[in-house]
């Protein structure tokens, strides 16, 4: 097989966090500024680090805002679930001797609070979170860190995500990319090496 490692983004790829992320951010901004932004205006925050999103929003006290956002996110934890078919997809890939990994813009704190309780963490051998690199998606650094940590060459890895940031990160790292189409974060055509309409397509195509 061409690839040894199949590396996944988390939000919008493995689990559906859009509602929780955007609504908790709306609540956070409202608490801080007194204004309530529109849902659609905050979709840019999906796929980048929380810190980067708040910086782009020109929130003055980032540390306070991150704490508020985390607290508001926990209130919506019950809305976060794996996408249908994800668990079966991961099981199928493991049964065919692929090594699974994660590269995410989440911090480790967010990873442990948002992702680990959903019962998917044990499928993955190597994890790279935002804490591991100074630069983040769409820069190459997160995937380069994964390749080093997992001792794998770029041509032996495939990175699967849902956003332009994921595909650009893969391109910048010299890694093939797969774009998932089951979440709603893609408004314009994005050029990727593979396109997956459902999680089952990953097992079919690879």
Regions found by a protein language model. Give the residues of each.
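Asp-based, Mg2+/Mn2+-dependent phosphohydrolase catalytic module
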Residues: 1-6, 94, 107-108, 112-206
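N-terminal helical cap/lid subdomain that shapes the substrate entry/recognition surface
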Residues: 2-89, 96
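Short beta->alpha linker loops
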Residues: 20, 45, 81-85, 106, ...
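Conserved phosphate-coupling serine/threonine residues in phosphotransfer and NTP-handling enzymes
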Residues: 13, 104-106
